Amino acid sequence: TNAPQVANPLADQTVDGSAATMAAEAAPTAEPTPEPTSTAAPVDIRVYVDYLSTEAREFQSANATQLSKWVGDDAATLTYYPVAMLTSKSNGTKYSLRAAGAAACVATHASDRFFAFNHELLTTQPAVDTDGYSDQQLADMAQGAGVSDVATVRSCIEDETYTAWAKAATDRAI
């Protein structure tokens, strides 16, 4: 597929530089003919998210409805990559890392509730330089997001089963 070209009116200007010469050289041509974009396959959308990042919260607030619609319409696939870039910004509690681990717990044990849990983490996000939520509060949020196997998810979150994975995922991302 050829992208349309934009003519530079000064590129091949004649020595006299007359307006007529420049206009003739800058006239667009009919080629190439644009072709419609194929819509056969869904668009693959990848979102890297730190649950303490205000930018991640703003992205979620601005785009969650549209992303959900595209996924529901099979127009897009959506993959979230929880990362913990702001681990040191929570008074030593490592909230960013623990929240990313909690998201991995929900993705592993209740994948059908991940989008709701992800949304809850971002829309009720604690402020930077605060303690953030405790592991028990994160588990309560997972339950509130509709996780059915509450005991397994709670144990996963409170035992911080996926924090090492979240740290490694963050290292890979950066």
Where on the chain are the PLM-derived regions?
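Extracytoplasmic thiol/disulfide redox context detector
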Residues: T1-N91, T170
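Cysteine-centric redox/oxidoreductase cores and disulfide-bonded domains
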Residues: L86-I174
